[in-house]
């Protein structure tokens, strides 16, 4: 099924230029949205919680900085870019009491709307603008006269102008230069969570660790296992990123290509696919989200326990030693924000 793709010529920039936009949060996406919107002629203010470490950065960038409630009262378009697990509380305490008829509430990810943690009144436009790249890339591409593709969606449209508003917003942050793709809150939320859990984070992490363990348990040095199962992954991912799986297979040796074809299906087989379907089902029916919410309400205890157990793996200790030998490798864990 072909998808629609919209560009700058399809968007009316004056729509968002005629609104007052509050960006709630000034992290990776927040700073990029705010600066790109401002340079596209949009009036922008930043909403931050009291005591936020981001206040100084936002003020140094020349933005009017308000608390979340003040920003919500001032604006008629509110883009909520705080972490998923904080959004419901911010909405309940600061945004909802200040929403006015005709206001629009936008998101960069659909989780809280799709699973009902946030339920605005019927007179509020609910939309999403989700660049498919990190904030620093969204900003850099905009400055270079380019853009990052964006997804847009409208969940509630009492005024009938939700898509035009979302498209205008997407164009103002540079998305229309690359392409704006309409979707739904359900599709964006489910596919995003599934990709993270089954492939990008959960699946990849377990594949790396298990490969490392197999080699070490067979008597090979942990350093050799680290190089072959983790370090070289970037080379492969870069090739896939640049030109797809076909490009990767074209670029590696015939030995690697042949071995991948005959052994890959032994690692990821029909049983794996069935378990992935189970993960998808848990996302679709809300099982995962209930567990996520319970973790937050429990003070992140489960997350902290999982994090500690995973961080204690031998592969982490091995990597710390080996990365000290690599002057070209940045270790963000040792950098200060």
Swiss-Prot record:
Gene Ontology biological process terms, A to Z: isoleucine biosynthetic process; L-valine biosynthetic process
Positions contributing to Mg(2+) 2 binding: 192, 228, 232
Domain of life: Bacteria
Residues annotated to bind substrate: 253
InterPro entries: 6-PGluconate_DH-like_C_sf, KARI, KARI_C, KARI_N, KARI_prok, NAD(P)-bd_dom_sf
Assigned GO CC terms: cytosol
Binding locations of NADP(+): 26-29, 49, 52, 54, 84-87, 135
Pfam families (UniProt xref): KARI_C, KARI_N
Cofactor list: Mg(2+)
UniProt domain KARI N-terminal Rossmann: residue ranges: 3-183
Cofactor note: Binds 2 magnesium ions per subunit.
Residues that coordinate or bind Mg(2+) 1: 192, 196
Ranges for domain KARI C-terminal knotted: 184-329
Annotated catalytic residues: 109
Family of the protein in this entry: Belongs to the ketol-acid reductoisomerase family.
Family matches, as PANTHER family: KETOL-ACID REDUCTOISOMERASE, MITOCHONDRIAL
Role description: Involved in the biosynthesis of branched-chain amino acids (BCAA). Catalyzes an alkyl-migration followed by a ketol-acid reduction of (S)-2-acetolactate (S2AL) to yield (R)-2,3-dihydroxy-isovalerate. In the isomerase reaction, S2AL is rearranged via a Mg-dependent methyl migration to produce 3-hydroxy-3-methyl-2-ketobutyrate (HMKB). In the reductase reaction, this 2-ketoacid undergoes a metal-dependent reduction by NADPH to yield (R)-2,3-dihydroxy-isovalerate.
Protein name: Ketol-acid reductoisomerase (NADP(+))
Higher taxonomy: Bacteria, Bacillati, Actinomycetota, Actinomycetes, Mycobacteriales
């Amino acid at each position: 099924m072909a998808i629609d793709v919209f560009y700058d010529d399809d968007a009316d920039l004056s729509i968002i230029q005629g609104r007052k936009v509050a960006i709630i949060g000034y992290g990776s996406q927040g700073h990029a949205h705010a600066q790109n919107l401002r340079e596209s002629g949009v009036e922008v203010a930043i909403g931050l919680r009291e005591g936020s470490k981001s206040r100084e950065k936002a003020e140094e960038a020349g933005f009017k900085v308000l608390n979340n409630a003040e920003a919500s009262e001032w604006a008629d378009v509110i883009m909520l870019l705080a972490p998923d697990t904080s959004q419901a509380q911010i909405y309940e305490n600061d945004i909802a009491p200040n929403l006015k008829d005709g206001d629009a509430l936008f998101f960069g990810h659909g989780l809280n709307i799709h699973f009902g943690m946030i339920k605005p009144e019927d007179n509020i436009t609910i939309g999403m603008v989700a660049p498919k790249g990190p904030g620093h890339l969204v900003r850099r591409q905009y400055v270079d006269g380019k853009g990052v593709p964006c997804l847009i969606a409208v969940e509630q449209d009492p005024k009938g102008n939700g898509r035009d508003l979302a498209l205008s917003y997407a164009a103002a942050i540079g998305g229309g230069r690359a392409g704006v793709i309409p979707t739904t809150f359900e599709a964006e939320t489910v596919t995003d969570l599934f990709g993270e859990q089954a492939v990008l984070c959960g699946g990849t992490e377990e594949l790396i660790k298990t490969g490392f363990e197999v080699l070490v348990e067979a008597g090979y040095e942990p350093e050799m296992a680290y190089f072959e199962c983790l370090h070289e992954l970037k080379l492969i991912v870069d090739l896939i990123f640049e030109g797809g799986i076909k490009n990767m297979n074209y670029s590696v040796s015939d030995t690697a290509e042949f071995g991948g074809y005959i052994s890959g299906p032994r690692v990821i087989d029909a049983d794996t696919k069935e378990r992935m379907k189970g993960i998808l089902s848990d996302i679709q029916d809300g099982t995962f989200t209930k567990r996520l919410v319970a973790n937050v309400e429990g003070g992140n205890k489960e997350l902290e326990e999982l994090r500690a157990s995973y961080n204690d793996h031998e592969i982490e200790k091995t990597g710390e030693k080996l990365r000290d030998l690599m002057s070209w490798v940045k270790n963000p864990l040792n950098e200060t924000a």
